[in-house]
Amino acid sequence: MKDKVCIFNAESDATAIELNVCDADVTINRATDSTLSVTIPVAKNVNAGSDKGTLYVSQTKRPPLFSRRQKIEISVPEHIVPALRLNARHCNISVEGGIYGEVNMICESGTIRIENTDADSVEINGGRLDIDVESSTLKGSLYINARTAEFLAQNTFAGLAVVRTRKGNMGIVALNTKECTLETDDGNITATLKGKREDFCLKTTEKAGNTVADGCLKSKNFNAYTAKGSIVVDFIEDERAADELAFADEGQNANLSEEENKAS
């Protein structure tokens, strides 16, 4: 038997989306029309609404013990949402598509997947996390700080990328970035960077003291550290990599101009 759900439609020009959830599967995806909507289970502990331009979803308490995980779905139209804020415990979070300003997530444990998403910046803080960022454009920064984390970024652009964890492996595949720092006290780091080797200042430190450093000034910087583990770095020479920053800026400016025209 299907769970009963409630659909809440909000103002499409929301300035923020805010969630406070626990033991839930949360999906934030691109809407098929211009409606900003939330689908939540019919339950006493879950509610949704809007206030002063902020769409919110909150759980007043945890679901009953041994009950099925609650499913929450938010559909976002194709325009910029200036802020996405999420405070979660034991949740699976998926952001698929959309254009955002600042994305801020605090998650005690669970999985976070960001795919085909544009954002000015993404910041994730938490405890035990499995994080996957794929085919996304982060104009500003990607910042992750977790107690334990398995991290993977694929085919993604980030002006600045910083990932720190006490324990866990990190992998990046075809990441285009000007500056990247990966740090784990216990884990392996595998990185494939877009660009030519000679364009990067490279510094890697592994096994408590084995350091390799260029000691140079170049257009891009990559730093990696592991106290217990190994570091492998490779490069993909892609002529388009140098232009992605310009393309990202043009795309963001075009989106902002479109929003300003709509507002006027």
Per-range role (PLM):
Residues 1-264:
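Intrinsically disordered, low-complexity terminal regions
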